[in-house]
């Protein structure tokens, strides 16, 4: 199923999600309204709330509470973006100035805190202790992942295992929670819950692998941020590690130095040459496709419905995208 058909299938539910997001962002504090609206209207993909919507429908849910789960998932994602951009000193996201560039670091951090706490208010409104447990654990793991990534900055010696732990924690865990919590809310079977959980984990991993790849081979304007940001920030992502381990000794030393020192955007062209020579970008894409295939396989426990087909379609879209 292509994105157009997925959007048609989820149009009513996603309209409810967007309305819930705007309603729950409302505050008596004007700056929260201004910055909150600035970030949520920034043209994000909404893939995480869409997973939540589709997962609930795929196991036969007919109520409306999945809209709340979808909205709070987007809130958690939004709060992490606000904090990430401060940590990374980013100035562009989704083709426009980041919130910290537009409003300042302090406002971004504090509004991020507000959005986190509002997400937990929404969780408690669902009346499901298990959903609260899963989401609380997910947010904790996400925070750990961000700290792990911070520890890995400027470290060219991190292992692939360490890298995969980081992307599971900071990205895939929220995908996993989105699918799992919707299944829990819908009263799905344990087998279906496990299938949804695995789907989210594998899809989130594939999604982040493609994100890391696009940092090196996308068009900056289309990507909506600066190409080579990871290199400039000294982040050792999988494409960079592959090129360092499979390139010439000279290329390996250049990449090692770029990671250690940061501020390496001027080395982007020779780094890309090394990646192309080693097939690093294609290798990373293949790894992402393997994860997407695992995500699709995990859905076999679900009934064969258009909702399941849409989840399968999302897995394909995640690895075929160019932004």
From Swiss-Prot:
Binds 2 Mg(2+) ions per subunit. GO terms for molecular function: all-trans-octaprenyl-diphosphate synthase activity; identical protein binding; metal ion binding; prenyltransferase activity; protein homodimerization activity. It comes from the Bacteria. It is an enzyme of class 2 (transferase). An all-trans-polyprenyl diphosphate binds at residues 93, 170-171, 208. Mg(2+) 1 binds at residues 84, 88. Transmembrane segments: none annotated. Gene3D superfamilies: Farnesyl Diphosphate Synthase. Isopentenyl diphosphate binds at residues 45, 48, 77, 94. GO terms for cellular component: cytosol. It catalyses: 5 isopentenyl diphosphate + (2E,6E)-farnesyl diphosphate = all-trans-octaprenyl diphosphate + 5 diphosphate. GO terms for biological process: isoprenoid biosynthetic process; polyprenol biosynthetic process; ubiquinone biosynthetic process. Mg(2+) 2 binds at residues 84, 88. The keyword Metal-binding applies. Its cofactor is Mg(2+). Disulfide bonds: none annotated. Its EC number is 2.5.1.90. The keyword Cytoplasm does not apply. Keywords: Isoprene biosynthesis, Magnesium, Metal-binding, Transferase. Belongs to the FPP/GGPP synthase family. Supplies octaprenyl diphosphate, the precursor for the side chain of the isoprenoid quinones ubiquinone and menaquinone. This is Octaprenyl diphosphate synthase. It comes from Escherichia coli (strain K12). The lineage of its organism: Bacteria, Pseudomonadati, Pseudomonadota, Gammaproteobacteria, Enterobacterales. The gene is ispB.
């Amino acid at each position: 199923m292509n994105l157009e058909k997925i959007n048609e299938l989820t149009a009513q539910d996603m309209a409810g999600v967007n309305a819930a997001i705007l309603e729950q962002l409302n505050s008596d504090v004007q700056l929260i309204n201004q910055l909150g609206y600035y970030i949520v209207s920034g043209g994000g993909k909404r893939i995480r709330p869409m997973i939540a919507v589709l997962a609930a429908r795929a196991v036969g849910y007919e109520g409306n509470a999945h809209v709340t789960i979808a909205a709070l998932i987007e809130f958690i994602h939004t709060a992490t973006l606000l904090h990430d951009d401060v940590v990374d000193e980013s100035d562009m996201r989704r083709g426009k100035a980041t919130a910290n560039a537009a409003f300042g670091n302090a406002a971004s951090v504090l509004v991020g805190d507000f959005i986190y706490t509002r997400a937990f208010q929404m969780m408690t409104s669902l009346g499901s202790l298990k959903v609260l447990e899963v989401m609380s654990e997910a947010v904790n793991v996400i925070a750990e992942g961000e700290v792990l990534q911070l520890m890995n900055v400027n470290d060219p010696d991190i292992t692939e295992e360490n890298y995969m732990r980081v992307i599971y924690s900071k990205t895939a865990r929220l995908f996993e929670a989105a699918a799992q919590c919707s299944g829990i809310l819908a009263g799905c079977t344990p087998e279906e819950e496990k299938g949804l959980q695995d789907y989210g984990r594998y899809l989130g991993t594939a999604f982040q692998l493609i994100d890391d790849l696009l940092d090196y081979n996308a068009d900056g304007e289309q990507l909506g941020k600066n190409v080579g940001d990871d290199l400039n920030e000294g982040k050792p992502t999988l494409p960079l590690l592959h090129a360092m381990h499979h390139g010439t000794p000279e290329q390996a030393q250049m990449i090692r130095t770029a990671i250690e020192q940061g501020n390496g955007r001027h080395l982007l062209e020779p780094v890309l040459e090394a990646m192309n020579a080693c097939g690093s970008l294609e290798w990373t894409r293949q790894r992402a496709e393997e994860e997407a295939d695992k995500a699709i396989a995990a859905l076999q426990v679900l009934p064969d419905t258009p909702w399941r087909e849409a989840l399968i379609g999302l897995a394909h879209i995640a690895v075929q995208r160019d932004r």
